[in-house]
Amino acid sequence: NMMSGIVHVKGNASQSAGATAHGGLLIIDGNASSRCGISMKGVDIVVKGSVGHMSAFMAQSGTLLVCGDAGDALGDSLYETEIYVKGKVKSLGVDCIEKEMKPKHIKKVSELLKKSNIDKIKPEEFKRYGSERKLYNFNIDNVSEY
């Protein structure tokens, strides 16, 4: 389990890259398959390509930054993780919504791009996604969403 430091994948990553990681920075030069960042708990993940379906599923904290596209059900059932995607998102998961990019988010994206040696992409090109916070506590009115 990744707790700190930097892991740099010099190509593509298979399923569940960065699963349950608590800290540090994971850089993937290529694409990441399904469930990238599943249940992440504080790690920052930068994918220079695209991510597959169910990425950031039940992600609790940290950041997932995707320079390409994202597959189905991005951010399904996530908590406080912030997701940034430059390309297209096929679909958002349950309780995941697009959110406003404020100056502090532009700064965060800029820092991650710099740490990952990405200088041809501007932070303003990304969209931000996060939890709508409807599923934090059980509510009978939302039972069909669980």
Residues covered by each model-derived region:
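Tandem repeat protein-protein interaction scaffolds
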Residues: 3-10, 22-25, 41
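Intrinsically disordered, low-complexity terminal regions
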Residues: 8-10, 15, 29, 35, ...
